[in-house]
Every structure is written in C-alpha cells, then in structure tokens.
Amino acid sequence: IGGDASSREGWRIAVSMLYGQMKDRAAAMTMIEKLNLCSAQDAKVQMAMADRKINAVMSTSAGRLFDGVSAVLGIRKASTFEGEASMALEFAAEAYEKKHQSAVDLQNVMDEMRKQFPLAACIDNKESESTEINKPEQVKAVLNTGALVKTIAEARLAGADTEKLA
C-alpha cells in the first residue's frame, strides 16, 4: 500500500503486511506503535488506503519483503536508493552472525522457516538462484508473506535478540 512511496519507505510495507495479517485495526495499531514504525496518523492513513484498495498494488518482489522486515527490526524504515533497506538488513544479519557464531545454527533456522513459510526457500541464498516462482500456489505463498513479517514483529516485541546492528 502506498504506490511508488512504498518502494522508498519500507515502513509502509511493514504496516500493510501487519494490518493484512492481523485483520484487526486496534491490534495492528498497538503493534505499529510499539515497533515505532510510523506516526499513528500515518498508520491510520495506510490502513484506510488498504481498506479502500487505494494505491494497493500486490508485489511478488522479495526486495519489498526485505524492506518491510528491515523496518520491523528497526534497521531502516526508509531508503534513499533502491535496495538500501535490503542491503542494511543483509549487513545486520552478517554482523549478527559474526557476533553470535556459536549461538545461531542457520541451517536449523532455515529448515524451520521452510516448513512454516514456503517463501523462505526463495530467500535462502543456496536456493535463490534455482528457485522459480511460476506456479499459482507459489505466487500465493509469496503474496501471503505478511505472516513472516508478523512473526518477526512479534519476536521483536517479545524481547527476542533483534538488536539494531546497522
């Protein structure tokens, strides 16, 4: 939701995905405020746009998903160039991995994510080059990745180690 502005402002994507998954305006507002994604007024405008399908273009871009995740984690809410939020998220993940090498078993994390979120297989670097999204059920899974953003947001609110690294 948000047209061209959403490609530069990942917070719009995060708000849209959270609201789309929660289907409850009050609950979404609470989470958006706790995550400090945007002002209450901006969140209300985004939700009204979603309800009325104004500037509501569905995207199958993994980059937009990463922009939303970057905003939810507090890494980058807006970008000055294409891919900035996604790159910041990648750098933060690499820094986290270096800092917590013994604490994170990435293979187990990816295996679990593949079970819960079909899109995770596309995100995994080892498979991203060979994974094609061309079947209706695959496209549906991509469009339903708001569940992934919601899960990440809930983990951050629950106090999971999602410290700002970028």
Residue spans of the language-model regions?
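Phosphate/diphosphate-binding loops
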Residues: I1-Q21
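A contiguous, well-structured pocket-lining segment that forms one wall/lid of small-molecule binding clefts
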Residues: S16-A166
